[in-house]
């Protein structure tokens, strides 16, 4: 059993697909927690969550014996209420964040940091940390860090559509992490051109910039086409098996990240680990929600 630190935000998701009301439920960092706990790993969760979601969260994770909740704090208010919209005409999902929780304190993470085999950080909202606090964690880590860009590249506002924005200071946030996960739209924002997706050559150039600040690998998720794995040895595409059906793609990248990082801590080579992660993620699109994701991981373990 490995020991993982998991940092992010628990969200309450309200999801529509092609303008039809579809799914409501918990989301955010609980997707990664569901996978790692379902696979039998020891997980220390660091997250702020709205008090109104306490019952739902505690009920959801009650049967996860390897989840350590000492870093989970319930704060007054509704927490992260997120409206997500998917449609065929959209290149990426649209997000409206109605409310948010305060940034996390680095101290509880730093206290546990020496115990971890790996640290997985997700910017579920983009409001998780002040930069100085996050940099203290990166500086103190002696284990691999996987960072998922996610909502870091969305405009920092509440109650309105969050546009993708350029983030010129991304190196100051991400330097020194081991694995950087982003999709093409997120890479576009980090490159300073959120208005268009990058070409293969531009993705490779971005990866070169990442390597220059100590990042060992860049993993660019490309939807049903799988993942681009970029290292100093060049790019490799890991193809995704065709999904039997598509119910909800919300947690697909989260499943990929958790499953891949788990194997990396066991010494599995990066491309092989990413291949297994993509396979599990392709199964995850056929279900919806945290509880079903946990059951999927349990079945993969068995």
Where are the model-predicted features located?
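Conserved phosphate/ATP/ADP-binding segment of small-molecule kinases
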Residues: 153-234
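Short, electropositive alpha-helical surface patch
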Residues: 55-70, 141, 196-214, 234-244
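Conserved N-terminal subdomain of the carbohydrate kinase-like
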Residues: 3-4, 12-23, 38-123, 127, ...
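Short pre-catalytic strand/loop immediately N-terminal to key active-site residues, enriched for Gly-Thr
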Residues: 19-24, 208, 239-250
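Short catalytic helix/loop segments, enriched in acidic residues and glycine
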Residues: 21-34
